[in-house]
């Protein structure tokens, strides 16, 4: 089951909640995932993102708690905070619980340790609205299980001497992260979010980084195929086409 | 400007938030309003609503705080808690602040006094997602100001010896409250929520009460006109048709 969820709020407990980003998290049928978190008002910000991360299914551990709740332990392969070595941000596994409310929204709670595992625990809450990934607008799903089972579920990956990256396609929504290896500054980070419109053209919504043109120009591909963009070869590691 | 907002969460501070209802609040151009709050899982509930209330624009006082925030003081004409005399619920004016977040969601904070004005203050938070009232699905608006200026904005009212009621139409969404005067039990309460579909037929979504058939069967009417449903005469007190 693919999933596209739009964040409704972020809360560092016990501070009041807020939402300053347009955050979308995409997950494929096989559990590959990316979350891209651009600020709505990015004026004056050199890096116009709160955060971005992603990984393949081997970077996430899911356990069912009950019909309504799962525990998810994330150990991101890609993490802009780690890449940039942002001080006072978490390293390593993040333990979370995802709980579905009657209304269909999904509450995520967990803890991070910005000052190391021996440091102060910071509890957080995020709230997620499942949206229909096959639509270009944000059309709410009553429950994330109501998602179209036939929606595109595609993942592309690159890992060569110079670059490592991941692109996730769910329905009409594409999100991507591309890191230049060994470059731990903004020059090493590329992010994008696009939509596949009714004519199957890719329309860019968010694009960041010197190498952003290396994100794949075509994504509706079969598993095992290769697509090259500005010299960078991407492998399709999952596709339901 | 009409408004249709879907509640995302309800929080009695400092308890954790939750959302067990599908709550919609509708407000017309002139400021007449209704909020209907049915539980998603109403099994076993004699009254399957958390609450419902409404009023005309003279039952609300709005003051601008800044570009992002307004204070709103509600003094409902219709309030199911008051009608049923539910113990430990608020009476009289409720003072609230509505603040628009960067993401377009609207945070409402305020206090109620369930044990009277001298009793304990209970702080609450609600969070609202503006949705497009001209659509049958829940299509999110980036900002409530993005609403279609031509959307239907209609209010119907009844106040005779036996009944008092209000119906609010914004876009394709209709919500209504009808009280039987002097009957302070569930027998005196009627609530409904409907949609006007593409064929201009009214499709019922929520319908409660012995007199629910008295809600108007036609609502796309001019200001000043009268429509009668099962003997009950409704006056159109606002219409932009």
Swiss-Prot record, chains A, B:
Keywords: Cytoplasm, Nucleus. GO terms for cellular component: cytoplasm; nucleus. The keyword Oxidoreductase does not apply. It is found in: Cytoplasm; Nucleus. Belongs to the HRI1 family. This is Protein HRI1. It comes from Kluyveromyces lactis (strain ATCC 8585 / CBS 2359 / DSM 70799 / NBRC 1267 / NRRL Y-1140 / WM37) (Yeast).
